[in-house]
Each structure stands twice: as C-alpha cells, then as structure tokens.
Amino acid sequence: MYKEKRISKGEFVRIRGLNYHVRTWPGIDASLPPLVLVHGWMDVAASYQFMVDAFSDAFAAGRTIIAPDWRGFGHTPSARDGQADSYLFADYLADLDFLLDHYAGDRPVDLVGHSMGGNVAMMYAGVRPARIRKLVNLEGFGLPANTPAQAPGRYVKWINELKTLHRGELTLKAYDALEGVAQRLMKTNRRLPLDKATWLAAHWSQPNSAGKWEILGEAGHKVSSANLYQVEETLAIYRSITAPVLAVEASDDSLSLWWKNQYSLAEYHERLRQVAQCTIAVFEDAGHMLHHDQPQALAQLIEGFLD
C-alpha cells in the first residue's frame, strides 16, 4: 500500500452546528498564508495526500495546509441529526467562510479546489475577494447553461428523486472488501495504480456493522439540485474575483466526455475571460483526477504560482 510522506492531523471543528472533519498539515512559518484544499463531489480531503506529499520540503514545512471534508462527505455529517436529503450549493460557500474564520482569522489564504470544490472556490473568491490571495481551480468547470423553461421540469425531477431516496432506492453501492473499493477507484481512473487505490479506498470508505465497505458519502448528494445553474450570476461573480487564478485542465477533456454537446471547453474558456487575472494550464497524460495522475507536476506548478 502507498505510504504517505507527510502525515495529516485530523480534527473536528464546530461549523454551523456540524462537526466538520478537517485534515491539517501544520507549517512552521505563520507569516505565510495558509493553503486551503477543497475536494470535489463524492471525494474526501484525503484525496489531496499524493499532491501534498509531492510538495517540496521547504514549501510543505513552511505553510499550514488545511483540507476539510465537505458536509456529507468523508467524516463530516450533513445534518445535526441524521442525513440531509438534498443540498444547497450556497452552503459550501458559507461553510468555507466559517472554516476560514477558524483557521485564518483575517488573513487572506491561498485556495485550491478540484471539480465541485473548484466551482466553490471560484464562487467564493468572487463573493469574498479580500479573503483569497491566489486561487487554483482544478477542473471546476461549472455547469451547462439552462433556460427558464427548464425550471418546472427541474422541480419535478428534484421532488421525484427525493421520493426515490426516501424509499431507499437511491443508494451508494457497498463492497464486500476494501479491495473492491480499490478496484472501483481504478475502474474510474485507469491511471491510478493499485497501491494508491488501496490507500485511497481506506480513506474513501469504511466497514459497516455487517462488514461491508461503504463509501463515505451520503446518498442525498445524488439528488439533483432544485435550482437551475445560473450562468449570468456566475459570470457576475467571476467579474468580482480580484485574486490571480490558475485554471488547470487535463488533456483527457473530461468536460466533453461528460456533457457531449451541452457544454464545451471553448464555452468554459469564454467564461474565464470574465476573471481579471486568469492563466490556463493543461496537463498531458491526465484525466479529471489530475491530482492523482500527475501529483509531482501539479505540486511543482502550484508552488511556482503561489510563490
């Protein structure tokens, strides 16, 4: 199994009534801005371990690195009592704001977000521009444009999926053994080697009382949002970002693989033109989980950008 180079400290912080699980790698130089890493959908904070291990000794020793499990993922619950049956995207922004109050106070931070976490990071940087010094967006593309005419159908879909969830028909697969979880991760990402997949599986799942390995993500995350994605609102927020932004993409073009003709890289790049200072970087031989596929190269790029 993969052996981590830098051991994180796991702790729980009370955030908006939830016991938020946060991994930290403490640094020795309090004058440096904290580096905050936020993960994507159906992922966990530990997903950044390979990238953290790839940072140079000087960089990793100097900065405090902070990586939370979003609500309903990893070891962070989604509700004070039980599990939420649907999620509001704005809650991630508020959770992040409270987390920064706790860990950074009034100091600006450097923020890295992957996928859904990249979307949160971009929105947050426009809502609270003074709190972000620099931002790295790892394939946080946003979503395809919608039309108002889609609203009735979206509400119907949301309600129907809630009923499916409450009937127990919208679940996450459980696995007989940890090896099964590792194989699932390798099937999703063909570049992920067995040693890293096994390590990730142990942090991405846990055994239940019956001995089955369950994914550390709540089924409510599979329910569609009741709210349509608002491109014009997103662009207005992008225009409010003052921090330099590094937008990193993988050569596999996962955006086209997911959305086909609904949303393209060209459209995403056009949206990024609304950000005052934005640089785009593309990683070869990488897919959507580029922090797993190219951790050394990504760590080096981030260090140079944050310098």
Model-identified regions with their sequence ranges:
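N-terminal cap/lid segment of alpha/beta-hydrolase-fold proteins
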Residues: Y2-N19
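Active-site loop/oxyanion-hole signature of alpha/beta-hydrolase fold enzymes
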Residues: I15-L18, T64-V112, G153, Q300
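Conserved HGGG/HGGXW glycine-rich cap/lid loop of the alpha/beta-hydrolase fold
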Residues: T24-D81
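Conserved hydrolase catalytic core segment
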Residues: Y103-A151
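A catalytic-pocket lid/entrance helix-loop region that shapes and gates access to the active site
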Residues: L138-K173
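Alpha/beta-hydrolase
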Residues: L172-L257
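Conserved loop-alpha-helix segment in the C-terminal half of the alpha/beta-hydrolase fold
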Residues: S240-A286
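Catalytic active-site module of serine/aspartate enzymes centered on a nucleophile-bearing elbow/loop
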Residues: Q274-D307
